[in-house]
A protein has these predicted regions:
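Multi-pass alpha-helical transmembrane bundle typical of ion/small-solute transporters
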Residues: 1-201
């Protein structure tokens, strides 16, 4: 099976999740700077969530560009990733209703670590399908950055019960680390399509 339908489904779910989040944003109670400041924390949380979803979507796009075809394992791994991304509006609304308390902030981290681990499972499924000599396996190597990010999310979940602001700070730092698109896959694809020198020339 070609990955086109998988990409289309992912694009649709991501677009819906982002739309739901922005529709759930509270409006300022007064048309003043004071009213805007009152909802500023939720606006920043929306921004962080938008960036996180965008990071997963961007990297997913690059990852799927290496797949010539997909199988059942890839389809299910992708569905698990979409499940966690689709939970983002739920945890954002919980934070809006409850405030930046320990449990909602920890739940935000659980969604992020779930998305991170399912993304890695999707990577593994594609590598299993295309082999260790496939473009994705050669581009990623050990993928230490992704593994460290998942560990950091796990630490943030625990720290949310100590101080939720520490957890939020960790979420922001991880997002900042991934804000620049990972160039490894693009570099690998460029290298594969670079014309080889003519030995007879």
């Amino acid at each position: 099976m070609k990955p086109d339908r998988l990409n289309a489904l992912t694009d649709g779910v991501v677009a819906i999740a982002i739309t739901i989040i922005v529709l759930e944003l509270p409006l300022p109670e007064a048309p003043t700077l004071t009213g805007l400041r009152a909802v500023a924390p939720m606006l920043l949380t929306y921004l962080l969530s938008f960036i996180n979803i965008g990071i997963f979507w961007n990297n997913h796009h690059h990852m799927l560009s290496t797949a010539e075809h997909v199988d059942g394992r890839v389809l299910w791994a992708n569905l698990v990733l979409l499940f966690f991304l689709s939970l983002m509006p739920f945890v954002i609304r919980w934070i809006d209703e409850a405030g930046f308390e320990a449990l909602p902030c920890a739940a935000y981290g659980i969604v992020l670590v779930g998305a991170a681990l399912s993304y890695q499972a999707l990577e593994a499924a594609i590598i299993r399908l295309h082999g260790r000599d496939g473009a994705l396996a050669r581009a990623l190597g050990s993928d230490l950055k992704a593994k460290l990010s998942a560990l950091a999310y796990g630490a943030a979940i625990g720290l949310a019960f100590v101080d939720p602001t520490i957890a939020i700070a960790i979420y922001v730092m991880i997002a900042a680390a991934w804000l620049v698109p990972d160039p490894r896959i693009e570099h690998q694809q460029i290298a594969e399509h670079r014309p080889r020198p003519d030995k007879d020339g």
